[in-house]
Amino acid sequence: MECCAPVIGEILRLMYESTFSRVANAIKFKSNVKALNESLERLTELKGNMSEDHETLLTKDKPLRLKLMRWQREAEEVISKARLKLEERVSCGMSLRPRMSRKLVKILDEVKMLEKDGIEFVDMLSVESTPERVEHVPGVSVVHQTMASNMLAKIRDGLTSEKAQKIGVWGMGGVGKTTLVRTLNNKLREEGATQPFGLVIFVIVSKEFDPREVQKQIAERLDIDTQMEESEEKLARRIYVGLMKERKFLLILDDVWKPIDLDLLGIPRTEENKGSKVILTSRFLEVCRSMKTDLDVRVDCLLEEDAWELFCKNAGDVVRSDHVRKIAKAVSQECGGLPLAIITVGTAMRGKKNVKLWNHVLSKLSKSVPWIKSIEEKIFQPLKLSYDFLEDKAKFCFLLCALFPEDYSIEVTEVVRYWMAEGFMEELGSQEDSMNEGITTVESLKDYCLLEDGDRRDTVKMHDVVRDFAIWIMSSSQDDSHSLVMSGTGLQDIRQDKLAPSLRRVSLMNNKLESLPDLVEEFCVKTSVLLLQGNFLLKEVPIGFLQAFPTLRILNLSGTRIKSFPSCSLLRLFSLHSLFLRDCFKLVKLPSLETLAKLELLDLCGTHILEFPRGLEELKRFRHLDLSRTLHLESIPARVVSRLSSLETLDMTSSHYRWSVQGETQKGQATVEEIGCLQRLQVLSIRLHSSPFLLNKRNTWIKRLKKFQLVVGSRYILRTRHDKRRLTISHLNVSQVSIGWLLAYTTSLALNHCQGIEAMMKKLVSDNKGFKNLKSLTIENVIINTNSWVEMVSTNTSKQSSDILDLLPNLEELHLRRVDLETFSELQTHLGLKLETLKIIEITMCRKLRTLLDKRNFLTIPNLEEIEISYCDSLQNLHEALLYHQPFVPNLRVLKLRNLPNLVSICNWGEVWECLEQVEVIHCNQLNCLPISSTCGRIKKIKGELSWWERLEWDDPSALTTVQPFFNPVREVPLLIADATTQML
């Protein structure tokens, strides 16, 4: 019996605890429900905030992103489960409450755990690097690749070692040197103030080393303005001074092909600036040794497992399936661990499920090994696989991109025009249709990793190795792709033995050619492309040289010093499709072009021609004429333009020639009515002499145009984002002008130095017709008759507010420059603008402007994203109404305020503009409050003087801590006063 006592006691204890727990849960049912509701509310809010902040993690490491995504997924599941249980408890009887209470407690524990993890994520999100010390360099990371991580660690060790002042990173092309140093750069950026360098400068050098270009990149990071006429020596001295001011700097020179004398660039020696370092990447160890590196790190190919993971990432999940995995792994191994090859082949095979296709690919890669004679060719074979997957048309398009110099950012429109001239684009109808097809091909080549984004908008370029591969294809081939590519090599002369009858394309662009051989016979009888642009020293093209290329379709002599073009009747270029003479500033005259029967494009932009090219009217296929920036063009004979029956594009932007209507033009000169006869015209940019054109509503041919730029009056160009169909009126009296018929087709209107603008505006308002297509309005240098203005305002506002016409219902941009308004409300009320679609306001040198919106106007501008105001001396605030319940710009992202000495406030005290991302305040010394709080999670950059920043007052003390990392101080300079000649008269 005694032995049973402990057992019975334990049983009774467990029964008591179980019973007590049930009773306690039943008693605490309501409190558990309340606790769960409160925790659930906090977790839901935390999850919402986390979603908004998710973008800020895009530049951080992958594991953190994955953890965040997993946390969000788990939080969503728990929130759904909790809400379901809370709904069930409503119908839960008293007898079931203990069980329900236990379930609620269990879910409550899960909610609290997720809440704790979420708070940790918020803490991580609040820690940001200092952006001005290290600029982010876009691209993939190698953090989780074993070999690359080891090499990165070696470089980091070198950065902390006193013995390693210069570090060389070397390896074969495409192995990942750039990716490695890019990762290093971005890791330093993430570390913010904890990393040891005051400034990190990332510079792309490239094969054809240009000291001036390298200096420009360094100077840009140092905020040093470069001037074209400044010598390299003088700029080097300024760079030296700038770098010596830095506490420590790290200079990363990427893609160095030849030894560089850093002294000539202005780089201080390491003994002069203790702790500073230089890293260079090169394909050749000899370059590193010549530059006296202290530590050389060889970049090897990826380990097999890392290579396989990279291959899977690019080829997709199909390679992990049982029927493909084994073969796919063999294909990955054939890439030899070379990242560029792995990415290219993986992308080419992405989503391919057919096993026979994979076997075919493996066979191709395996069989190519025996005839490879060099390491570089081993790189090309995997690239050739991707190339072979292209259609024939895409192959030719790809190879043509290799005609440009290394690291050259190619204008997409230029290369597509070449493709069109070569006949690669299908005849889809208009040039615009063909251009769209070409852009689609560009995107396809980018998807295959054979092209990548260029350094500027709407440009592309080739990776060095990919370009080398393309040249290898063209130089070794004897078929339609056989080409001679010597672009950007510093070539000073071209020998005849370099040319061959089998050549299809010849690129000698961007060299130092001073002369060309005068050949005596048709030699390059298959050549369709001859690129000679960028040879600034070339003054003459011998007729014999061009006669050697009888089948040319593309001839580019842009940027040369030629004064004349050989007689076309002697050249016999009967197949020529496109002739580019852009920026041949010495060219003043052309021969008759009537024998160029197949010519479709002529580019004379920036030439000094005096008269319209002769013979174009005889060309039945001619479609594109560029006469922009022809500053000396004086004559266009009558009845010539009207005969260009196939013309689709006439670009005379910033040309000296001014078109007139019939009856106003000089005798024998073309009139604007001739342009109306061009039934196929789609793109037009011209300058008109005066306003009669605007009075003639019969010019409805304009509505046929897809794009137009019409400048009426003096030459005046101001770019906006909506210039597809733009009308500019400059230096004219427009009191009698009626432009309503034209505004119906216009997307952008600019009025500059115009008199009688009140009468014109009054007519537009009285016509009671809105202009739905107009998205941009610019008013500049306008003095408004205040009495007339007030009269029009009162006339318009006398209507019921609901009846007021919105003259510009889709306006997105508004630019006011040197306009004597006191409030923006005057313009808004007079024109009946509701501003519901307005995104950008830019105001400068409006000396009388006191406020944007006055006390009578409680308008909000719901979609406004950017405000930029400068040199408005009288501006005191943005909104005169002292109390309004919500921000009048609830979606503002960018706020730029410059040189506003009397600006006192931009918002109510304590008001918050949650969407703000970028703030710039310079020389606004009386402004002491910003609409920013600690909840403004989108702030990316705040720019201003340090003294102003330190004077700011904060309604929310924690706001300063939150946004301090995003503040970029600017150099404090005296307030610039605009020249009197630029002020209102």
Curated annotation (Swiss-Prot):
SUPFAM superfamilies: L domain-like, P-loop containing nucleoside triphosphate hydrolases. LRR repeats lie at residues 502-523, 526-547, 551-572, 575-597, 598-620, 621-643. Gene3D superfamilies: Helical domain of apoptotic protease-activating factors, P-loop containing nucleotide triphosphate hydrolases, Ribonuclease Inhibitor, Winged helix-like DNA-binding domain superfamily/Winged helix DNA-binding domain. ATP binds at G171, M172, G173, G174, V175, G176, K177, T178. Disulfide bonds: none annotated. The LRR repeats probably act as specificity determinant of pathogen recognition. Disease resistance protein. This is Disease resistance protein At4g27190. It comes from Arabidopsis thaliana. The lineage of its organism: Eukaryota, Viridiplantae, Streptophyta, Embryophyta, Tracheophyta.
